[in-house]
């Protein structure tokens, strides 16, 4: 049986590495839908994958801002009509702008919630309302959602909500045979991490491909034995 996966935030970092793991290593995922904002990084990633993709596999890239709920819902509906059932969703797209409590701007707070919380919710709800039955939903949270950190109020709050939302999704969707896994990576060398900790040496922390390997395991045959509300991975 061939399967289709959808990965948000697929232009770089954990998202792009997850796409690569699915396309090149998965036993049964043959189609990967890639959502990301229009950027040179995303265009370069698309070209690289098209040049190296194995026979019988394909990518379906879409330029979409996960923080724009209306555009996101439309993109999800259109791609579902095009590719059919989406078996695996990896809600990876994220945003942060770390500032002290006194300097938090409400517009920026709302943007953080839009991308980090409403984005995953919109993807899942839109597909459910289109009749899609998932095998696996992976919501990427963060250890910052477990233990809030100074200066990371908006990001930590949004990721804490993702952890809780994942618990509810897990309970509600179990009747359909859907597994919902929330993954909370620790320090990972991504663009978002550089925003949170600009002075940190990225070579000393976990790499995106390490997290992607964990996600690949969730989607593999052995992954059906993994059913947890929140899994922490850290180096």
Write out the residue ranges for each language-model feature.
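Conserved glycine-rich cofactor-binding loop
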Residues: 11-12
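Conserved glycine-rich Rossmann-like NAD(P)H-binding loop of the short-chain dehydrogenase/reductase
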Residues: 27-44
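Substrate-binding pocket helix/loop in short-chain dehydrogenase/reductase
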Residues: 100-101, 108-110
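Active-site helix of classical SDR
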Residues: 124, 158
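C-terminal helical subdomain
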Residues: 175, 182-183, 190, 200-235
